Amino acid sequence: MIQNESRLKVADNSGARELLVIRVLGGSKRKTGNIGDIVVCTVKQATPGGVVKKGDVVKAVIVRTKSGARREDGSYIKFDENAGVIINADKSPRGTRIFGPVARELRENDFMKIVSLAPEVL
């Protein structure tokens, strides 16, 4: 569960390394987000020469969380870190590569480009 002020690692090669969550999108009372949710973030750390710079406000989709996501069959999936992928307005990733595994729930939320670029879908 990701909330305001949560820090996310970046799982793509857009140039950002760490994000700070400003807002979880999806309603005025929405407090937390899980895998597949879109969040508004600011870039806290960035690599030199990247597409995004430190201080940029971007939208990202959550691809991994430490707190588990419950699936329809009753199983849970948990990861070792909280991570996100920076996206454009049309839900396509800003980077050209995705690092690390992503959850199968992204396929249900129409993030097919991220799923196809990911090395492993759990």
Curated annotation (Swiss-Prot):
InterPro entries: Ribosomal_uL14 (IPR000218), Ribosomal_uL14_bac-type (IPR005745), Ribosomal_uL14_CS (IPR019972), Ribosomal_uL14_sf (IPR036853). GO terms for molecular function: large ribosomal subunit rRNA binding; structural constituent of ribosome. GO terms for cellular component: cytosolic large ribosomal subunit. Keywords: Ribonucleoprotein, Ribosomal protein, RNA-binding, rRNA-binding. GO terms for biological process: translation. The keyword Ribonucleoprotein applies. Gene3D superfamilies: Ribosomal protein L14. NCBIfam families: rplN_bact. Binds to 23S rRNA. Forms part of two intersubunit bridges in the 70S ribosome. Part of the 50S ribosomal subunit. Forms a cluster with proteins L3 and L19. In the 70S ribosome, L14 and L19 interact and together make contacts with the 16S rRNA in bridges B5 and B8. Belongs to the universal ribosomal protein uL14 family. This is Large ribosomal subunit protein uL14. It comes from Lactobacillus acidophilus (strain ATCC 700396 / NCK56 / N2 / NCFM). The lineage of its organism: Bacteria, Bacillati, Bacillota, Bacilli, Lactobacillales.
